[in-house]
Amino acid sequence: MPTVPSIATPRFELVSMSLPFMEALARRDLGAAEHLIGAKVPTQMPDDLEHFLEYRILDLTVEPGWQPWLGRAIVLDDPRAGRRVIGSVGFHSPPDASGQVEIGYRIEPEFRRQGVATEVVRALFEWAWREHGITSFRASTSPDNVASQGVLAKFGFVQTGSQMDEYDGEELVFERKGWRPSS
């Protein structure tokens, strides 16, 4: 499996979550996961982690070349607590036939409302634009997730519909076409 370079932001390092890392998380082998990612991982795992890992492990097993597009751990280098994972961000897959990618992100509760999502989403959009010329983005969120909708609004996303997700239930669908850095 190729090594995928990290993406640096002013406050964080976005470290690609490799297949071995995700397999270690799925086994709840936190020691192995921490060794592989180079940071402490939360001991309290989100409720939807198993579902996320199931899909991403299958994706990377079948399509190893997808790794740069998929999940990245948001790593904070905290002078007091050391390097630790405080969330994740990534695309659901490489671009579709129209050149669009769908983004997803999750921030640990204690780090929400501090601009983390905005910073890491911007960094991932800039990477997709700089490395692959991507200017069309999609996102889906629960109707109740006002904070996530606020992040999307900052990037000029508009709601284009809704959908029923077999796992998450009703989701609002947002799109942003023609995105460029600083737009």
List each language-model region with its residue ranges.
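GNAT-family acyltransferases
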Residues: 1-102, 107-110, 123-127, 131, ...
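Short Gly/Pro-enriched loop/turn and capping motifs at secondary-structure junctions
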Residues: 110-112, 145
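Glycine-rich acyl-CoA binding loop
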Residues: 115-118
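Conserved beta-strand-loop-alpha-helix junction that forms the acyl-donor binding cleft
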Residues: 139-149, 167
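Conserved active-site tyrosine of GNAT-family acetyltransferases
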Residues: 152
